[in-house]
UniProtKB/Swiss-Prot annotation:
The gene is priB. One of its GO terms (cellular component) is primosome complex. Residues 4-103 form the SSB domain. Coiled coil: none annotated. Homodimer. Interacts with PriA and DnaT. Component of the replication restart primosome. Primosome assembly occurs via a 'hand-off' mechanism. PriA binds to replication forks, subsequently PriB then DnaT bind; DnaT then displaces ssDNA to generate the helicase loading substrate. This is Replication restart protein PriB. It comes from the Bacteria. Keywords: DNA replication, DNA-binding, Primosome. SUPFAM superfamilies: Nucleic acid-binding proteins.
Length: 106
């Protein structure tokens, strides 16, 4: 059985990051990444758009999360998983394993 679960998504942080520490002492940073691009499908151009919740966990990743604010442009590498909210609804979340800040050229 093939079990590949990899996602790379670039975009702009569109919601203020929430930083928490779990009861076991693991730091977590949660934010939403908005992606917009033009993709080719069946020989035609189409607009692609999504908002993806992102979770960054662990001490080694927290240094980069301190510079993340609304408007920061990022490329996130990681895996996706389903999380169930308090309301019982499930959503797909990107668990970041690597984050690259995109230089806006300002």
């Amino acid at each position: 059985m093939v079990t590949v679960n990899r996602l790379v998504l670039s975009g702009t942080v569109c919601k203020t990051p929430i930083r928490k520490v779990s009861p076991s002492g693991i730091p977590h940073c949660q934010f939403v990444l908005e992606h917009r691009s033009t993709q080719e499908e069946a020989g035609l151009s189409r607009q692609a758009w999504c908002r993806m919740p992102v979770i960054v966990s662990g001490l080694s990743s927290q240094a980069v999360t301190h510079s993340i604010t609304v408007g920061t442009q990022l490329t996130v590498h990681g895996f996706i998983s389903c999380h169930q909210g308090r309301n019982g609804l499930s959503k797909i979340v990107l668990h970041a394993e690597q984050i690259e800040l995109i230089d806006s050229g300002d």
